[in-house]
């Protein structure tokens, strides 16, 4: 006969056993009961307590507590009334005739609403974390780190965690989330080589694509002024070239090539696995210019003096870091750009009218609006407060997008950013006071009205976009931004009884659906081309809501399918991104949840897993590498993820040289003998090779001239050598 356990010997309380959750086994009250305000009971028999009895006791206990609370509030109200009534009754001898008494405040029933009927809503809180090194970090509520920690907490409450396989996968997922949160630490760097001036041939080839596809989204320079800057660099001696101008030229090339890379990715995704190549000239070029951008970061102290070109260099570096490097570095670069812009009065651009040319004034105006919008994006993604208040920026009420060189979508985006700032100041800021239901409802209604007016003025029909497959990519972006702001508005007040605040999961699903549609849409004036930049600027609440719904068992099969499609899309656009970049971390977080979902499905299909191997063959194969101390993008000792052969060729160090490579034959079966013959082969290849519609004759000429440039800077290798010709020919074949 089994030994009967006494109350003191029984290891699980009745409440935790009834809820099927892990008990901390602390007596007289475990942690779960203490957190939920329940009376921790120990039956001593090891049996599951009766659910009806437990529910009855819970309801009676809550009723008793509510009755005590109402009584205490009523007594407090009476005491306060007596206090105010007593203070208003002043004896005649105590009154001062020179200053008549002001009417005493009278308390009405409206001053003390029933606390049971009127809930109080406070601002959402962030997360405070102390790591193993005792480093303290604070994350805002909308930051990716804070949302990842929320998902980590939710994993243990997800269904089927009592099963061994699912439990192991959940524990592994929590470790992976801890690793993701710890990524992106800035490490001080020592002296490094300054950035090198990129080849002028490539620069000239990229100016027109940038101002055609990317400038409307990030109006950092005017085309006229940038062309003048590039011409001045070409005519000046290497020792006299300005560092900020070099950084601007390098980043323009990088942004233009990055904007075209999603199209290259989609072309590769349409190819079979047998014919798909793992490398392309796009990515090899990007990694070379990205290395040059990292060198600019290492010399950031030379870019903080008050000059307009320094502001432009810092803003372009921020955009590059937003996509390729860590969130922390991106935020730091924008903060430096904002401080430098304020010091030269960029936001008071109207004050320069009459003193500067119209082109210079318009350039400052566009840069001011661009900074304001980027500041609001970082406010949500990094969880920090805005650095540029609307009071510091001059918004022209007569602004017409088609006039004065103003991009068409800039006005709508700036107005949307102003609404985002209002949402932050009224809901997320530190000074926000608690509000009741009516106050929360009234503010939300006012913001929704402003958002609708903003869409109407830009000609965007949200209902039509949601119900049909039509709509331009630019309208899709505005609709996604609209849904994102709506989610920021209602997400902190999920427990509000108004139906509007219960729509967060539906809004998040629609936002994810439109994002996937934008990804698959054809290029539309560059809107699809800058998809990576756009995705990195969105707060990740949409993904958080979808992941939470799936983990809690409320997600549908369509949600899981969209998540899988989202993972594939992120994998496509983050192949050459740093592990700590924003989009790459979105990809890794989505993979973690996908692993947990797959483990659940596998467990349900095979309740008795065999011991021959792991039950789930899909356990984050890309995240199973040994954990590191964090991504150190500024550490000179860290191995950078780029093709060293290309970096040694384009941005040649003094002691660098081309690595030996195998030869590649021409179309005739023989190696090209000279540079002229090789250049003609490049041009003919650009015209005949399939899928090379983006590499026109100008681009081919730029690549050919770059061979001559590399020959001049590479001192130890000839441009006619087989290694140089083979490298370029191989990359062209990989397009």
UniProtKB/Swiss-Prot annotation:
GO cellular component terms attached to this protein's record: nucleus
Gene3D superfamilies: Zn(2)-C6 fungal-type DNA-binding domain
Cell compartments where the protein resides: Nucleus
GO molecular function: DNA binding; DNA-binding transcription factor activity, RNA polymerase II-specific; zinc ion binding
InterPro entries the record matches: AtrR-like, Transcription_factor_dom_fun, Zn2-C6_fun-type_DNA-bd_sf, Zn2Cys6_DnaBD
Uses, biotech or industry: The sphingofungins A, B, C, and D, show a limited antifungal spectrum of activity but are especially effective against Cryptococcus species, fungal pathogens causing opportunistic infections in human.
Annotated knockout phenotype: Completely abolishes the production of sphingofungins.
Chain intervals for the UniProt region annotation (Disordered): 89-110
Biased composition (Low complexity): 91-106
Keywords, in A-Z order: DNA-binding, Metal-binding, Nucleus, Transcription, Transcription regulation
DNA-binding region residue numbers: 13-40
One GO-annotated biological process of the protein: DNA-templated transcription
Xref: Pfam families: Fungal_trans, Zn_clus
Matches recorded under PANTHER family: MISCELLANEOUS ZN(II)2CYS6 TRANSCRIPTION FACTOR (EUROFUNG)-RELATED (PTHR46910:SF1), TRANSCRIPTION FACTOR PDR1 (PTHR46910)
Functional description taken from the UniProt entry: Transcription factor that regulates the expression of the gene cluster that mediates the biosynthesis of sphingofungins, bioactive molecules acting as sphingolipid inhibitors via inhibiting serine palmitoyl transferase (SPT).
Record's protein name: Transcription factor sphG
Originating species: Aspergillus fumigatus (strain CBS 144.89 / FGSC A1163 / CEA10) (Neosartorya fumigata)
Gene, per the UniProt record: sphG
């Amino acid at each position: 006969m089994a030994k009967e356990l006494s109350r003191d010997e029984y290891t699980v309380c009745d409440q935790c056993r009834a809820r099927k959750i892990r008990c901390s086994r602390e007596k007289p009250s475990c942690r779960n009961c203490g957190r939920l305000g329940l009376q921790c009971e120990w039956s001593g028999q090891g049996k599951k307590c009766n659910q009806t009895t437990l529910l009855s006791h819970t309801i009676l206990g809550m009723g008793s507590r509510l009755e005590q609370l109402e009584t205490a509030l009523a007594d407090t109200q009476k005491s306060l009334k007596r206090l105010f009534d007593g203070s208003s009754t002043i004896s005649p001898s105590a009154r001062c005739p020179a200053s008549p008494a002001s009417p005493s405040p009278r308390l009405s029933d409206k001053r003390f609403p029933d606390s049971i009927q009127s809930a109080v809503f406070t601002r959402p809180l962030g997360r405070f974390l102390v790591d193993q090194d005792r480093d303290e970090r604070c994350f805002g509520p909308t930051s990716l780190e804070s949302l990842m920690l929320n998902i980590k907490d939710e994993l243990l409450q997800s269904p089927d965690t009592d099963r061994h396989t699912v439990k192991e996968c959940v524990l592994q997922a929590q470790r992976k989330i801890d690793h993701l949160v710890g990524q992106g630490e800035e490490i001080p760097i020592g002296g490094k080589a300054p950035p090198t001036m990129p080849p002028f041939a490539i620069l000239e080839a990229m100016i027109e694509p940038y101002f055609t596809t990317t400038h409307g989204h990030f109006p950092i320079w005017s085309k006229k002024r940038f062309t003048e800057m590039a011409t001045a660099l070409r005519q000046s001696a290497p020792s006299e070239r300005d560092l900020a101008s070099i950084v601007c030229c390098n980043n323009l090339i990088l942004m233009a090539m990055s904007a075209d890379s999603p199209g290259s990715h989609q072309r590769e995704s349409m190819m079979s696995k047998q014919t798909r190549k793992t490398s392309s000239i796009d990515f090899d070029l990007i990694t070379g210019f990205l290395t040059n951008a990292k060198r600019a970061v290492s010399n950031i102290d030379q870019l903080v003096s008050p000059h307009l070109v320094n502001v432009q260099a810092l803003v372009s570096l921020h955009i590059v870091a937003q996509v390729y490097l860590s969130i922390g570095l991106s935020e730091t670069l924008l903060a430096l750009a904002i401080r430098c812009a304020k010091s030269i009065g960029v936001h008071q651009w109207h004050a320069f009218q009459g003193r500067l040319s119209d082109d210079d004034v318009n350039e400052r105006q566009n840069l001011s609006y661009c900074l304001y919008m980027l500041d609001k994006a970082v406010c949500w993604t990094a969880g920090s407060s805005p650095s540029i208040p609307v009071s510091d920026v001059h918004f022209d009420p007569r602004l017409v997008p088609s006039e004065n060189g103003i991009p068409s979508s800039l006005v709508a985006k700036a107005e949307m950013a102003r609404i985002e700032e209002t949402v932050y100041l009224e809901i997320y800021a530190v000074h926000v006071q608690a509000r009741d239901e009516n106050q929360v409802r009234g503010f939300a209604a006012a913001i929704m009205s402003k958002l609708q007016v903003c869409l109407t003025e830009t000609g965007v029909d949200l209902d039509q976009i949601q119900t049909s497959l039509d709509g331009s990519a630019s309208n899709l972006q505005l609709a996604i931004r609209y849904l994102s702001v709506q989610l920021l508005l209602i997400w902190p007040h999920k427990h509000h009884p108004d139906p509007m605040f219960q729509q967060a999961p539906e809004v998040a699903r629609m936002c994810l659906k439109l994002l996937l549609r934008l990804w698959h849409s054809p290029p539309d004036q560059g809107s699809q081309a800058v998809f990576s930049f756009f995705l990195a600027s969105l707060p990740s609440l949409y993904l958080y809501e979808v992941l939470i719904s799936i983990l809690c068992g409320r997600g549908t099969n369509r949600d899981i399918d969209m998540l899988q499609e989202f993972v594939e899309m992120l994998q496509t656009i983050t192949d050459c991104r740093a592990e700590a970049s924003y989009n790459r971390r979105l990809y890794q977080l989505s993979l973690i949840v996908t692993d947990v979902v797959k483990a659940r499905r596998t467990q349900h299909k095979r309740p008795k897993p065999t011991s021959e191997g792991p039950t789930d063959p899909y356990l984050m194969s890309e995240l199973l590498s040994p954990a590191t101390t964090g991504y150190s993008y500024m550490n000179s000792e860290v191995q950078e993820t780029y093709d060293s052969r290309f970096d040694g060729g384009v941005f040649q160090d003094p002691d660098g040289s081309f690595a030996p490579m195998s030869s590649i034959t021409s179309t005739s079966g023989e190696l090209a003998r000279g540079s002229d013959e090789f250049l003609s082969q490049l041009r003919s290849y650009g015209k005949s090779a399939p899928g090379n519609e983006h590499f026109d004759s100008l681009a081919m000429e730029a690549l050919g001239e770059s061979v001559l440039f590399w020959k001049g800077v590479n001192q130890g290798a000839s441009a006619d050598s087989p290694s140089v010709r083979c490298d370029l020919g191989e990359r062209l074949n990989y397009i």
